Amino acid sequence: LLDGAGVPYVLTEAETVCGGITKNTTAKITIQHGLIYDKLLRRFGIGRAGQYLCAQKAALQKYRELCSGMDCDFEEKDAYVYALEEQRKLEQELSAMERLGFHGDFVEHLPLPFPVAGAVRVHNQAQFHPLKFVCCLAKGLHIYEHTPVRELIGTTAVTDSGKVAAKAVIVATHFPFLNKHGSYFLKLYQHRSYVIALENAPDVDGMYVDEAQEGMSFRNARDLLLVGGGGHRTGKRGGAWRELREFARRYYPGATEKYQWATQDCMSLDGVPYIGPYSSSTSNLYVATGFNKWGMTSSMVSAMLLSDLVQGKTNPFAEVFSPSRTVLRPQLVVNGFEAAVGLLAPTTKRCPHMGCALKWNSQEHTWDCPCHGSRFTKKGKCIDNPATGDLTSC
C-alpha cells in the first residue's frame, strides 16, 4: 500500500518473507472471528464494535481486489462458528451482528462427523494460499531478507550491515521486541495451535471453527482436509498432534495423514489486535500485533490503518485498535501471575528475553517460555520471539 501511494519505504526481514507464522496459517479470510461481536458490543459499545466489523469487511474486500488475477487459490466460502452445547451463545452473536447491520444465519446441521448445538454462518468469506499470494505481491517491492534489526535509535534501525534512517518505523515482528515502551510483555501472551492435513477425507465445503478457544477447526485445501486443534498456551501442556490424531482415527478412519504443522499466535487481553502508535511516549513508531489467530484480515487491517497513519491521514478504524486503549481484563492478572511464577521458578534454563523459567515441550522437542512465548530448539537456537538471542547453554 505504501508502494502504491508513492511513499519511500524499506522492509527488513530477519529470515525469509513468510518463513514464520504465515506459512503455518490455515488462511481463513473472514469477518467472523469466533463469537466476537456480542463480546465487542458488551465491552466497547456499538461505535467501536462497528469499527471492528467495518475494518474486517474492508480487509476482505481488499483481498478480493488484490487476488483478482493472482494464482493464489483464492476461493469464496461460507464461514461457520459452531457450538457443541450452548445454542444461546449463537443466538446472542446473531443478535449482535444484526444490531451492527450485518446478517448471519443460524444453521442446525453441519457436514462434520459429530453433533453440534448449531452454528452461525456468514456467506461469501474466503480462503487462499498465503505463500502464493505473498510471492505475487512481493514482486518489485523493496524487501531485504536476512536483515534483522538489532536496535532502534529513535526512527533509525540498526542492522548487522548498516543503519536505516526513516521518518517512521512500523514494528511488525509478531511479538514486539521493544520492552521499555507499551508494556506488551504484560498485554500479550502466546498460544500454540496444531494442524494435520488428511487425504481421503470428505469435502466439508466451508470453513468451520469451534466457539471454544481449544476447539477444532476445519477447511479443505484442494484434495486435503485441514483439521486444527490441540491448542494451549505456549509453555503449558496441551493435546497437540496427539489429540488431532486420536480425532482422525475416530471420525475419519479411512483418511491418511499427509502433513502436520504447528503455529503460534499472539493473543491480546481483550480479543482485539493492537494496531497503531507503539506507545503514548514514542513518536513516529508504530506496531501491529495481537492478531488472536485471525492474522489474515488483521494483517490487512494493519496495512490499511498504518499506511494511513504514517502518511499523516486519519483512519476510521484507529480508535478500536489503539494500542493505548484501556485493557484492564482478567487476562492481565493471569499474564502477571505467569511472569511471577516463571521468574521465581528454580531452574537453570531461563529465557534471555526477561528471565522466565523455560519448560520442556516433549511433543515438539523444544524449550518454551510460558511467560511470553519464546521458543528454542533442544540445542538452544531461538525459533520464536520475543527473545532475540539463543540460549547460552543447554
Please identify what each model-predicted range represents.
Residues 196, 346-394:
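Rieske [2Fe-2S] iron-sulfur-binding domain
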Residues 124, 212, 241-246, 252-335, ...:
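C-terminal catalytic lobe of FAD-dependent flavoproteins
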